[in-house]
Amino acid sequence: MAKTMPRKSETEKISTIPCGERLEYARKVANENIDTALNLIGVYYARREAFGQNSFASKLPRSRAVGTFNIIMQRLAHAQCIETCRFWDKAEENGKSIPTIMEYCRNTDIEARLFLIAESCYPDDNDQTRTYHESLVQRFHTAERLIHKSNTDERLRRTQNFRNRIAHNLLSTRTDSRLLAKGEKPLVPPSAATLTALGIRTLWVSWLFHSSLNNADFDFKHSVNLLRRRSSDFWGSLS
C-alpha cells in the first residue's frame, strides 16, 4: 500500500511560493484590507453614535420599538466581533488576514524591497532615499511588533472565543470546555471597549502594511472622523 504523504501546513505551502510572488500577494492583500478595516471602524461608530446625549437612542419612546433597536445594536456588536477576528485569523495560503500578510513577507528580504520603493520615489537624491527607506522599514517593523503583541493579547483571545460561539451557534467552545475541565471559568465576552481597541489596532496595522508595502498613504484621522460624522448624520436623520 502506498504511503500517504503528510499534508503541508499553511505556512509550509506559503514558504514554497517564490519570493517575488509572495511579496506581490502581500501587497495585494494589504491594499484590499484598508477599505475592509475602515468598514470595521464604521461599524464601531454606527453603534457609538446611536447612544449618548441627544442621540437617537435617547429619543426612542418606551415601546416595542426599543426591542427592534436593541436587536440592531446586538447584531452590529456581533458583526464588529466577527469582522475584527477575520483580520486576525491564522495565516492561510489564500487568506487575507494580517498574519497572512506577515507570513507572505517572511524570508523575502523585505528591507531590500522597501529600498527599491524608496529609490523609485527619490531617484536622484541618495539622502532622501535613505531617509524614506528608514521610514518604510520602521512602519513595517511596527506592524510586525503589533502582530507579535496580539499573539498573546487576552482581549483578542476572548474576542475570538466569542466569535466562535456566535458564528457556530455554540453554548460553549472547546476553549471553554478546556477551562472548565481545569476548574477555571469560561472566557467572558469582549466589552465594547475591547472591540474598540482591537478595531483601532486592526486599522493601524492595516495602514502600516499598506503604506510600507505599497508606498500608499491616506489621511488616517480624516478618514476616521469622516466615518464618525457619517454615522452621526445617519442617526440624526432618524431622530
Q: What kind of feature is each model-predicted range?
A:
Residues 144-178:
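Histidine-centered, metal-coordinating catalytic motifs and their short helical/loop contexts
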Residues 2-154, 182-239:
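Amphipathic alpha-helical interface segments
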